[in-house]
């Protein structure tokens, strides 16, 4: 059983993982990627201390920082969550696995609504941003 299961690996999820791991709690982060919406951002200019950085670079730096601690990354989608009779959280994954944890933090973030126009996907992060 894991102390903390975190759904989402964007800035909030990675920060939660860092804080929990530094307190010597066992941590699992469940996501389909590391970085979330940052990965689709060409340039970030409002992150304190890093005035000009690409979303990919910032996600990479955050990932490296978190990986200095024993955090288990689980690359899967989440189908559902529930609480069992003992108060533990069950996280059902799209690969059929079920994770069990004492605490659940949901930082699923969001995905932008796309316009579905020609060139949108190929230029996302390179001129097209949301």
PLM feature segments, named:
Residues 20-21, 42-45, 118-122:
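Short, glycine/charged-enriched secondary-structure capping and boundary segments
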Residues 24-26, 70, 125:
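A generic structural signal for alpha->beta connector loops
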Residues 39-98:
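N-terminal Rossmann-like dinucleotide/flavin-binding domain of flavoprotein oxidoreductases
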Residues 14-18, 64, 106:
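A broad detector of short, well-ordered amphipathic alpha-helices
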Residues 1-5, 35, 73-130:
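FAD-binding core/adjacent interface of flavoenzyme oxidoreductases
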Residues 3-28:
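N-terminal Rossmann-like FAD-binding beta1-loop-alpha1 element of flavoenzymes
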Residues 26-39:
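N-terminal glycine-rich anion-binding loops that anchor highly charged ligand groups
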């Amino acid at each position: 059983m894991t102390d903390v299961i975190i759904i989402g690996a964007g800035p909030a999820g990675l920060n939660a993982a860092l804080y929990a791991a530094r307190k010597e709690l066992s941590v699992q982060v469940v996501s389909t990627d590391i970085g979330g919406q940052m990965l689709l951002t060409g340039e970030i200019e409002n992150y304190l201390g890093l005035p000009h950085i690409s979303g990919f670079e910032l996600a990479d730096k955050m990932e490296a920082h978190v990986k200095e601690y024993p955090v288990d990354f689980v690359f899967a989608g989440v189908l559902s969550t529930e609480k069992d009779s003992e108060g533990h959280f069950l996280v059902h994954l799209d690969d059929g696995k079920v994770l069990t944890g004492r605490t659940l933090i949901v930082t699923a973030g969001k995905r932008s609504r796309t316009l579905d126009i020609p060139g949108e996907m190929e230029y996302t992060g390179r001129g097209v941003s949301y």
